[in-house]
Swiss-Prot record:
Active site (catalytic residues): D254 (proton acceptor)
Compositionally biased spans, kind Low complexity: 638-655, 675-686, 904-918, 981-993, 1072-1083
Source organism phylogeny: Eukaryota, Metazoa, Chordata, Craniata, Vertebrata
Main location: membrane
Species whose genome carries this gene: Mus musculus (Mouse)
Residues with Phosphoserine modification: S500, S1035, S1159, S1162, S1175, S1178, S1253
Underlying gene: Aatk
Protein name: Serine/threonine-protein kinase LMTK1
Protein task: May be involved in neuronal differentiation.
Amino acid sequence: MSSSFFNPSFAFSSHFDPDGAPLSELSWSSSLAVVAVSFSGIFTVVILMLACLCCKKGGIGFKEFENAEGDEYVADFSEQGSPAAAAQTGPDVYVLPLTEVSLPMAKQPGRSVQLLKSTDLGRHSLLYLKEIGHGWFGKVFLGEVHSGVSGTQVVVKELKVSASVQEQMQFLEEAQPYRALQHSNLLQCLAQCAEVTPYLLVMEFCPLGDLKGYLRSCRVTESMAPDPLTLQRMACEVACGVLHLHRHNYVHSDLALRNCLLTADLTVKVGDYGLSHCKYREDYLVTADQLWVPLRWIAPELVDEVHGNLLVVDQTKSSNVWSLGVTIWELFELGAQPYPQHSDRQVLAYAVREQQLKLPKPQLQLALSDRWYEVMQFCWLQPEQRPTAEEVHLLLSYLCAKGTTELEEEFERRWRSLRPGGSTGLGSGSAAPAAATAASAELTAASSFPLLERFTSDGFHVDSDDVLTVTETSHGLNFEYKWEAGCGAEEYPPSGAASSPGSAARLQELCAPDSSPPGVVPVLSAHSPSVGSEYFIRLEGAVPAAGHDPDCAGCAPSPQAVTDQDNNSEESTVASLAMEPLLGHAPPTEGLWGPCDHHSHRRQGSPCPSRSPSPGTPMLPAEDIDWGVATFCPPFFDDPLGASPSGSPGAQPSPSDEEPEEGKVGLAAQCGHWSSNMSANNNSASRDPESWDPGYVSSFTDSYRDDCSSLEQTPRASPEVGHLLSQEDPRDFLPGLVAVSPGQEPSRPFNLLPLCPAKGLAPAACLITSPWTEGAVGGAENPIVEPKLAQEAEGSAEPQLPLPSVPSPSCEGASLPSEEASAPDILPASPTPAAGSWVTVPEPAPTLESSGSSLGQEAPSSEDEDTTEATSGVFTDLSSDGPHTEKSGIVPALRSLQKQVGTPDSLDSLDIPSSASDGGCEVLSPSAAGPPGGQPRAVDSGYDTENYESPEFVLKEAHESSEPEAFGEPASEGESPGPDPLLSVSLGGLSKKSPYRDSAYFSDLDAESEPTFGPEKHSGIQDSQKEQDLRSPPSPGHQSVQAFPRSAVSSEVLSPPQQSEEPLPEVPRPEPLGAQGPVGVQPVPGPSHSKCFPLTSVPLISEGSGTEPQGPSGQLSGRAQQGQMGNPSTPRSPLCLALPGHPGALEGRPEEDEDTEDSEESDEELRCYSVQEPSEDSEEEPPAVPVVVAESQSARNLRSLLKMPSLLSEAFCDDLERKKKAVSFFDDVTVYLFDQESPTRETGEPFPSTKESLPTFLEGGPSSPSATGLPLRAGHSPDSSAPEPGSRFEWDGDFPLVPGKAALVTELDPADPVLAAPPTPAAPFSRFTVSPTPASRFSITHISDSDAQSVGGPAAGAGGRYTEA
C-alpha cells in the first residue's frame, strides 16, 4: 500500500485493484482531497496572477512615462505620424532637438513649442518663471516649457478670468496670424490653451525685447548701436514681415517699432506681447472712449474728428504701408519718437488732418540715404498712390543690397585701396594668379566693384595689376597709380589698352577674342577699366551684368544690369551701377579692335583693324537694338572720359586698327547718341537704333565682328566713337553692357536701341559723330564738319546714329555701303574710312538724313532735346564763346561723359559738367561756358538725391548738354580735324550719358537743356546732316561723323586752324603724350579733345590728313590728341580723342563747307575742347573737393597716373601694348570722385564747387585742358583720365592708348592716345573712378542713384536701370 501511495499512478489506479475490484473507501477520500488541493492551488495561482496584474495596471496609471513604450505610445505614434511618434517614443528624441535648438532662443521656442504641440502640449507643461508685464487682456509671464530633459523659454499671455466673451474672441483673434503663419520675420504663436479659463497664448520668446527699446538702449551706449547695414537689414525684415501678413490677407493693427521684437541673433520679428500700452504710454493718444490711438504712426485716412471726438477706423493694407514708412524712419532714428517736438494735438492737427507736417530725413548717415528717405516718402503718399508692401519690400531689398555691396565691396575695398599707400589692394591683386584671370574676371563682373576687388585681397583677381590710389588732401584728391605687371600683364597681352594687362586680357578672353564680340566683356572691363587703350580704374562701380564687359557693365549695362539685378544690388546691380559706367571703359580693354581687347589692337596694330570691323559687326548684329548700347558703351565710356586715350591708343594700335576703330567709333558714337537720347526721356528725336542702324548698324556690327571684341575695341579704337556712343547709349549708362557689346550685345538690345533712338543724347552722339566724321571727311580744316557735327548733334538726335553710315560715304566720298564695309580699312587711308567703318554707308547716309530730319524734328522733344540741347549747346556755346567755348566744348564732352557715367554721382558729375559746361569742364565747356543752360539744368533737374546718386540723372543732363557742345566745340574750335571730330564724338558721348539722365530727373533736365542747344543748332545740323546724308559720299562732315572715329578726328586734327580759332591758343597746351610722335598724333592743338573722352574717337581722325600727323595714328582720339598736347600746338581735344576718325576723314569735304556755319560753330566748340588740354585742365582745375589736381599740364595724369612719356609713337604704343607693363591714363581715362557715396562723402557739395571751379578751368588757359578733360568728367573727379599733358593714364604705357595707334590705330596715330590722355580734371567727387571713358559710372553714388532710380524711378529709367545696383 505504501508503495501504491507513492506511485504516481496510484491516484488513478488505486481505486481499482489489479483485478479491477474497487479499493477501500479510504482511497476514494484521498483522491478527492488531492483533487481539491489541486483546484485550490490553481485558483490561488490565478488569483495571485490577477492580483499582480491589477497591481501592475495601477502602477502604470501613476507612472505613464515608465510605460512610454507601451501600447498607448504605439497608438499615439500611429496617430501623430512618424515625426510625432518619434518625438513621443523618444522623449530623448524629442528632448534632443529642443536641447540643440535651445541656443537660438528666438527660434528655439518655436521649435520646442511645435514639438510640444505635436505631443499635445498643454498648460501642465508650462512653468511660470516671472511676470514681465501686463496688457489690456491681463498678465504676461515669462515661462518655460519642459519637454523631457530640455526646456525652452516662452512668453505666456494670460487672459484675465473676468474677460467677457467679446474680449475672449479678441484675445484669440489677435494671435491668429501668428498661429497660422510661419515666417522668419513673424512672431510665432506656439500654442493656444482655450479649453478652460484662463485662456493662454504661448508665444516664442525674443530675448532682446522690442526693437524700440533695444535701439534706445543702444543709443545710450553708442558703441553698442547697430551699424547702418544692420539697420538697413532690419528695415528690410520689417517690410518682409508686413509683406507676409498682407500676402495672407492680414493687416497689423499697430505697426511700429515697439511692436517689432528682436531675437538673440538680431532678427526682427513683427509681432508683440501686448505690452506696448503699458511700456510706451506716450506713444498713444487715449480718447475719452478709452481708444488707444497710435497717432504718430497711424495713416491720416483712418482718423477723423467729429465734434472733438476721434473716430478711428480699422487698419488697411494701405494704412499699414504708411505705418511702415514711419517705422523705417523710427528705425533710422534709433527709436526716436516721430514729431518729437510736437504735442499729440499738434500732430493731429498738422500731420494727420492737414498733412502739412512731414517727418524729416533721418540724420543717420546711410549709403543711399536719400533713396531710403525717398522710399519713406513713397509710403506717405495718398492711399491710392502709395506703393504696396511688396513694392516697398522690393525697393528696400534693392537699397539694402546696394548698400551692402557698396559698403562691403566698394567702400571697404575702396578705402583700403584709397589709403595713402594704396598698396593693400595692390599686393593682393598681384598675388592673384594669372591662371585665375578668367574666373576672376567673371567674379569681378559679378561684383559691384571689380577694380576694388583687384585692389583687395578678396576680389582683385588678375585685375589687381593696376592700382589707383586716391588720397584725399586739403587740396583735393591725390591720385597715385601703381601698376603691377605680375598679375595680368602677361595673362592678357591683347592690347596694351587695358590698364591692367590681366584685366584687359581677361576682358579679351571674355569677349571672344578675334572674331566675335566678347561675351564676358563686363568682367574684364570692370576689372581693367582700360579696354585696349582706355584703361580706367573704377573704385566704385560694380559690373551691372556678369555677362557684360565690366566697363560696359559699368556703362550701358549698369542701368540695365541694375534693372536686371534689381536688384542684384549693386552689384549690384545693383551690381554696380555706379561702377558700371566706369566699367564702361573696361570694354575698351577688350579692345574694340581686337577680339582680345584694345590692348591687343594697340599691340597688334594689324589685328586691330581687321578685328575692328569684325567685332563691331558681331556685336552690333547681336544687339542690333542693343547695338548702340553695346557699341557705345565701352567706346563711349572710354572716349568721353578717356575716349581719346582709351579709344585713341586702343584704336591706334595700327593704321588698320584705326580704320575699324573709326567705323566702330562712329557706330559706337551713333549708338551712344541714341542711347543718350533714350536715357534722356525728353530726347524723343533720337530714333531707335534700327532707324539709324540700317547700314550703320550693319557696318558697325561688321566692324565689331571684324574686331573680335569690336564693341570693346570700338570704345578703344574709335575715339572712341564707340565709347561715345556707348556712353550716350541708354545702356551706356550701363557702359559695361555696351562696352561688352560683343558678348553682351544680345543682352543689351532693349536698352541700347530703345534708349538710343528715343533719347536726344543718341542723336547728340550721332550728331557729334556726324559732325566729326563730317569734319574729318569734309576736310581737316573745313569748319563745316564741325557745324555739321553740331547740327547733327543738335538737330538730329536720331540721325546721329545714321550719321555714322552717312559719314562713311561722306568721309570716303564714296558710296556709303562700300565705306561701311571697308570703313575700317579705308579709315586709316582717309577720313572716309573712319566714317565707313562706322556704318554701312548706303543706309547710314539715308539714315543720317532721316536722322537729321528726325533729330531736328524730335530734338525739341524731351529726349531729343537732351541730345539736341547737349549737341547744339556744345556747338552753339563753342562758336559763341570762342576760346572759352573751346574749353566749353571740351567740357560738354566731359559732361556727356559725366552724363554717361553719372547716376547717383552723376548729380555731382552733372553739376561738374554743368560747371564744366560753365567753364569748369573746359573740355566740354562750350555748353557750360557758353550756354550753361544745358549743364546747369542737368544739375538742377532732379533732386540732389537723384543727381548725386543717379548716374542717369546727372550724366544725362550734364553729358547731354555738355557732350553735344563738347563734340560741336572741338570740331569747331579745334583747328585740327581730329579735335573737332573728337568733339563730335564727345557730343555723342554726352548723348550716351544722357541715358543715365534718362531717369525721371535726367529726362526733364535733358529736355530742358537740350532745347537750349538743340533748337539753335538743331536745324543747321539737321540740314547739314541731311545734305551730307543725301550726298553721303561727298558730305565730309556727316560722313566724318558717321565715320568720325577717324575721319572726323583727322579732319579736326588736320585742320586746326579752321577749327581752332580761339581754342587753338589753348589747344597748343602741349601734352607729352599728345606729342608722342610716331603716332603722328597731330600735335594739333586740337581742342583739348583729350578733355572730352568722347573726343577719344578723334584720334582716328588724326590719322587722316590734318594739322597734326594723322597718318601715324589717326588717333586724334583723346589720347592721341592729348599726346599731341605734348606738342604745344596740339591741345588735346577731348572730343577729338573720342572720335577715332581716319585721316582721310579729316580731309575737308565739300559737304563740310556747306555746313560751314554749323561746322565752324562746331569747330569753335571743338577748338574749345582742343584748346583745353587735359594737362592744363587737370592742373588748373580747382574744383572743390576731390578734383584731380594736376600739378602741371604734364601732370595731368592724376599725380602719377601717367607713367608713360607724353610722346608716344605708334611703335612705342605698340610696344606698350605688347608689354602691358606701362600703365598710362589717357584723356579717355577719368577718375570719378563722388562725394556722396565715396569714402570722402563729398558727393553733393563738392560737385557744385567743382562746377564753379570747372568754369574757371574752362576760362583758364593751361589748367583749362585738365579741367576740361575732367570737368566734363567733373562729376568724375580729379582722376579724370589723363592728368598729365599727355593726359594718359598710367595704363597708357601698358596700352597702346598712349601710342594711341595700338588701340586707336584705326582712329589716330599712336600719338593720338595722348590726346585722349588729356586729364579731365575730375569734378570733385568723393568717390572716383579712373576710366578712359567719360561714361564711367559712379560706383557708390552711381549704384545708389541707379538703385534709387531703379527703386525710385528716375535712375531706373536711364543710367539707373538695374539694373544700379
